[in-house]
Regions:
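Detector for Asparagine
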Residues: 5, 36, 52, 86, ...
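Acidic/His- and Gly-rich active-site-bordering loop/insert found
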Residues: 6-102
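Generic, low-specificity signal for short hydrophobic/alpha-helical stretches with a mild N-terminal bias
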Residues: 16, 20, 108-109, 137
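General beta-strand structural signal in soluble alpha/beta enzymes
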Residues: 46-49, 69-71, 104-105, 139-141, ...
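Residues forming anionic-ligand binding surfaces in small-molecule and nucleic-acid pockets
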Residues: 96-115
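Acidic/histidine-rich catalytic neighborhood of metal-dependent amide-processing enzymes
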Residues: 110-182
């Protein structure tokens, strides 16, 4: 739970976000999740033609700028296509290797791993929870990053006119998120 301005919000859990299959080009389920989150919390948002999601929370004065957080909505694993079509969740298993804890996605039909850790569902998770935590913030969620940054290349530049800086939450290497749980 998160208390903001005397209101209590249920924070989005990482597990909720990781469970959503979102193969590149088939990201409707995660976009729908983000849109529903915005509606639930009364956040201003819009989608562009590519289905990038742009969110604004709060107001700024004329001489101020918004901070902005950014994440991408797609993953690279083809075995998720069937799960997306059937609107199935990815099973999340926690495994322990000595002192290390690792979250892995599992395909329920094949009982085999799917996904590469938190790329970039951790970014989506962080951005959504920051929208709850801060009074003034913009967030952009780009589609098809894993197949040539198609969403960000066609981003609405006007959304960023009043942005002072942006922070992107994406991992530099395979399984980077799993390594951060040590």
């Amino acid at each position: 739970l998160c208390r903001i301005n005397k209101k209590i919000y249920v924070m989005v859990t990482l597990k909720e976000v990781l469970e959503i299959p979102s193969y590149s080009g088939m990201e409707d389920l995660v976009v729908e999740f983000i849109v529903n989150f915005c509606k639930k919390h009364g956040l201003d948002y819009y989608l562009d033609d590519k289905k990038n999601v742009y969110v604004t929370k709060g107001k700024i004065k004329k001489d101020e700028y918004f901070p902005c957080v950014v994440a991408h909505t797609d993953t690279v694993h083809r075995d998720q296509k069937e799960m997306i079509l059937n609107r199935e969740k990815i099973t999340i298993k926690e495994t322990k290797h000595g002192k290390k804890t690792k979250l892995m996605g599992w395909n329920g039909a094949t009982d085999e791993p799917t996904g590469i850790g938190g790329d970039d569902k951790v970014g989506v998770y962080i951005c959504l929870n920051m929208l709850l935590e801060f009074d003034t913030l913009k967030a952009a969620f780009f589609v098809e990053e894993e197949i040539g940054m198609r969403g960000s290349r066609e981003a609405d530049p006007n959304f960023f006119n009043d942005v002072g800086y942006a922070i992107q939450f994406d991992g530099p290497t395979r399984n980077w998120f799993s390594k951060t749980l040590m």
